[in-house]
């Protein structure tokens, strides 16, 4: 029998507004930069999950996993700070942290 392991997941739902985007192409360029930085610098898995056809809005789902709730909370805080610094007035973030046991029932 395998030993029990601590496993946690952080899920962030990120709502962004791009007031200066004049086209889908402009929004997608900005969004690609944000997604690349989150993934490359912070190891976050990111997907666009809403408002793909709107010029000035986007909703992203971001996730991270870890073996320590404290470490995962710190990583989530860093992601939020990065986004709020980049989009101080046009970003809203919802965060959920849970253990694997909570998710799997």
Predicted feature locations:
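A general secondary-structure signal for short beta-strands and their flanking turns/coil
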Residues: 7-11, 55-57, 76
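N-terminal first-folded block
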Residues: 2-40, 45, 82
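A short linear hydrophobic-aromatic micro-motif
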Residues: 43-49, 93
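C-terminal structural segments of small proteins and small subunits
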Residues: 68-104
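A structural signal for short, well-ordered beta-strand segments
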Residues: 12-16, 60-62, 93-97
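Short, charge-patterned binding micro-sites
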Residues: 47-67
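Short, charged/polar surface micro-motifs in flexible loops or helix N-caps
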Residues: 19-21, 67-70
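Short amphipathic beta-strand and strand-loop transition segments with alternating hydrophobic
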Residues: 1-2, 97
